[in-house]
UniProtKB/Swiss-Prot annotation:
Entry protein name: Cyclin-dependent kinases regulatory subunit 1
Subunit structure: Interacts with CDKA-1. Interacts with CDKB1-1, CDKB1-2 and CDKB2-1. Interacts with CYCD2-1 and At4g14310.
Keywords for the protein's UniProt record, in alphabetical order: Cell cycle, Cell division
Any further remark recorded for this protein: Plants overexpressing CKS1 show reduced leaf size and root growth rates resulting from an increase of the cell-cycle duration with an equal extension of both G1 and G2 phases and a shortening of the meristem.
GO molecular function, one term: cyclin-dependent protein serine/threonine kinase regulator activity
Role played: Associates with cyclin-dependent kinases (CDKs) and plays an essential role in the regulation of the cell cycle that affects plant growth rate. May inhibit both the G1/S and G2/M phases.
Protein family per UniProt: Belongs to the CKS family.
Species name: Arabidopsis thaliana (Mouse-ear cress)
GO (cellular component) term, any one: cytoplasm
Protein's gene: CKS1
Signal sequence extent: none
Domain of life of the source: Eukaryota
Biological process annotations from GO: cell division; DNA endoreduplication; mitotic cell cycle; regulation of cell cycle
């Protein structure tokens, strides 16, 4: 069975992005014409930290999943957790 491949992260002014390349045997599990929820993409074996959203399908290559999350997402989560500990 092939391995799921993860790109390096890339950025714009608002989001950080990454793409995930699925092997054929996993790609065939993808539903047609819709995006996956976090629970769904985790269920097919995609592993990444919290906050990533499957935001687009690259029609010419549907085995490539496109993800994004807000810039500084992890830092915001750590700050919220720290604030809860202080209260």
């Amino acid at each position: 069975m092939g391995q799921i491949q993860y790109s390096e992260k890339y950025f714009d002014d608002t989001f950080e992005y990454r793409h995930v390349v699925l092997p054929p045997e996993v790609a065939k599990l993808l539903p047609k014409n819709r995006l996956l929820s976090e629970n769904e993409w985790r269920a097919i074996g995609v592993q990444q930290s919290r906050g990533w959203v499957h935001y687009a399908v690259h029609r010419p290559e549907p085995h490539i999943m496109l993800f994004r999350r807000p810039l500084n997402y992890q830092q915001q989560q750590e700050n919220q957790a720290q604030n809860m500990l202080v209260k």
